[in-house]
Amino acid sequence: MVSRILVALDRSPTSHTIFEHTLVLTQAYSARLMLLHVLSSQSSDSPSDPRIMSLGIEGQLSMDWVKSYHDQWAKFEQESLELLKTFEDRAIQAGLETELTQTYGNPGRVICDLAQSWNADLVVMGRRGRSNLTQWFLGSVSNYVIHHVPCSVYLVHP
């Protein structure tokens, strides 16, 4: 029986499709829903690390760049939380018992840890559709989760 569904969402356009699949599943099972977004500097849309972008002539990190990075990261965090709350509002309007969490870390590990601590019966997530070579170099969050999470996984393809 599926009574707890954890959905991992990011800021990609695919997240809307993933959320729609999750709504259907959660309603069908009359399950509780946990919405998760993991803030990671490895996300394709996260602010660039100023250590990479702004080494000065003397190898010093510009304080302007550090402030800019901090401001960009705060905006990224706020926009991500607003999107997650939009999904939460839709789930609540659909009559679903819903929680949300946004945290920092390695997405694969955070998903697996939360699935275990929250006692999820099902994890719903997407995959990026990267090439095998890109997956080999960069890894794959969905591949990590499939092999490490203690419950079933529903994978939404792009």
Cite the ranges covered by each PLM segment.
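Small/aliphatic-rich secondary-structure junction motif
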Residues: 3-67, 94, 99
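Structural beta-alpha unit
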Residues: 42-43, 74, 78-123
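Glycine-rich, Arg-bearing micro-motifs that act as flexible, cationic patches
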Residues: 122-147
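Short, flexible loop segments at boundaries between secondary-structure elements
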Residues: 151-158
